[in-house]
Curated annotation (Swiss-Prot):
It comes from Amborella trichopoda. InterPro entries: Ribosomal_uS8, Ribosomal_uS8_CS, Ribosomal_uS8_sf. It comes from the Eukaryota. This is Small ribosomal subunit protein uS8c. HAMAP family: Ribosomal_uS8_B (MF_01302_B). The keyword Plastid applies.
Amino acid sequence: MGRDTIANIITCIRNADMDKKRMVRIASTNITENIVKIILQEGFIENVRKHRENNKNFLVLTLRHKRNRKGTYRKTLKRISRSGLRIYSNYQRIPRISGGMGVVILSTSRGIMTDREARREGIGGEILCYIW
């Protein structure tokens, strides 16, 4: 079986969040760096740091929690398109998550971007995941 790096990112963040961990370490690839950059820009994580150990690159993510520490800041991360079932959308049919409050991450011909950027540029692509 092949590895799904995007599902791995989502699962690592979700598990660390449920376990109330402050940091999570994931393998660094071009795809993971682009997705983490979008998640950071949207404010779902606090900080990203590159780390090298035994000739392997990792990203160390600092998760964002509520100030009172009773709950997590991020609510839901969901993988949409996967290796067995690819989901594509043109720019007019990109779904709006939580009335525009959530984020859809797409893989387009111009790189990985959010739903807002794809609509602005008028391009569609593969829907990778939802964050809301």
